[in-house]
A protein has these predicted regions:
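N-terminal "arm"/small-domain region of PLP-dependent enzymes with the aminotransferase-like
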Residues: 10-11, 15-72, 203
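Active-site phosphate-binding strand-loop segment of PLP-dependent enzymes
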Residues: 51, 151, 155-207
Length: 396
């Protein structure tokens, strides 16, 4: 029986490779940080991790994780509603609610689960979900699992969003779903205008803060802080796997009744093991650190501005950003692959993105800055970009 399936899969995999879309996994032999070593012994500077605040190898978080294992064990061996809820889980949910100024929080194994398990428990065929065209795959999948009527508006296009809201007026409930920061371009959702339209057309607002929490806003509290939208957003989702330590774990935070219903009906929550105590303990310590100082956020923003200013001065085409994501536009798919390969030879680890990950003709190198980067790291990366850019005719 597997013979036919094997033949089919082999052809599919060959087609993926022929199209240049096969994903190879590079093996890292050090902790995740700005300077890493890969399994061939090569030392490289990492500019493609979501380690925005540089906390992935923070010793204070490592110590907190070890302490949590000593006091609360290695794993939970249960879902939350049976015997998988410890005092640490409730403490972390309270800390997340405090951070986002919300009423309650529910933890998930990943933000993919948070988004995947959000819509189906809350909305039916009587309702409407209005989603940004560039939302993350987890939001798209979550919407697909729900029977609500679906609308999609062009990225951050408020006229198109208003058109969708007008068309959805006959539905019982409406919710606008958007990423806070869009991961390929690094642009920030215009949350103030989204909230204005939501209030005008009686819609709820959901924001995924995965790439924006810890990064965007005067003190890094996300797009809600950036646009002073506290109290206007009904649901936030997010991850502990990016700025907040980089391990794993996701969450949904918002109105109390919404969170309570998710505890009753959200399938990824009901049928997945609780997040491990080590992750919870380290995450609690991380939120304490962010309360004590916003120095890491300040350093991150300084690094972003330093990198962008010098890359623009060198002649590169970079999309506008208010986040830690800098999209260096190359437009040609093969050029983006060649550029990334040459950067690796210069000791800089970046990734080229091209269709179907981004639209045709929009290939780019996505650079992700971190508070873990020092000025010497940035200078080396900029010098490599300039060298490779000249070799490939991207800049003069």
């Amino acid at each position: 029986m597997y013979g036919k399936m094997k033949e089919f899969l082999a052809k599919e995999l060959a087609d993926i490779k022929a199209a240049g879309l096969y994903k190879n996994e590079r093996i890292i032999t050090t902790p995740q940080r700005a300077d890493i070593k890969v399994n061939d012994g090569e030392d490289v500077l990492n500019f493609c991790a979501n380690n925005y605040l540089g906390l992935s190898d923070n010793q204070r978080l490592i110590n907190a994780a070890k302490e949590a294992m000593d006091t609360h064990g290695f794993g939970m061996s249960s879902v939350r509603f049976i015997c998988g809820t410890q005092d640490l889980h409730k403490q972390l949910e309270a800390a997340i609610s405090d951070y986002f100024k919300t009423e309650d929080t529910i933890l998930y194994a990943a933000c993919f689960d948070a988004n995947g398990g959000l819509f189906e428990p809350l909305f039916t065929e009587e309702d409407a979900i209005i989603s940004d065209a560039l939302n993350h795959a987890s939001i798209i999948d979550g919407v697909r699992l729900c029977k609500a009527k679906r609308y999609r508006y062009a990225n951050a296009d408020m006229a198109d969003l208003e058109r969708c809201l007008q068309e959805a007026q006959a539905q019982r409930h409406r919710i606008i779903a958007t990423d806070g920061v869009f991961s390929m371009d690094g642009n920030v959702a215009p949350l103030d205008k989204i909230c204005e339209l939501a209030e005008k057309y009686d819609a709820l607002v959901m924001v995924d803060e995965s790439h924006s929490a810890g990064v965007v806003g005067p003190t890094g509290h996300g797009v809600a802080e950036q646009f002073n939208a506290y109290g206007r957003v009904d649901i936030f989702t997010g991850t502990l796997g990016k700025a907040f330590g980089g391990a794993m774990g996701g969450f949904t935070t918002g109105k109390k009744e919404i969170i309570d219903m998710l505890r009753q009906r959200s399938r990824p929550y009901l049928f997945s093991n609780s997040v491990a105590p080590a992750i919870i303990g380290a995450s609690l310590e991380m939120f304490k650190m962010l309360k004590e100082s916003d120095a890491l956020h300040t350093k991150l923003i300084d690094n972003v501005n330093y990198f962008r200013d010098r890359m623009l001065a060198a002649g590169f085409d970079i999309k506008p950003t208010q986040s830690a994501i800098c999209a260096v536009m190359l437009y040609d798919a093969k050029l983006s692959q060649d550029f990334a390969a040459k950067m690796q030879k210069e000791g800089i680890y970046v990734t080229g993105f091209y269709y179907p990950v981004v639209p045709k003709g929009q290939a780019r190198i996505r650079v992700q800055l971190s508070a873990g980067h020092e000025k010497a790291h940035l200078d080396k990366a900029i010098a490599a970009f300039i060298k490779v850019g000249k070799e490939l005719g991207v800049i003069k």
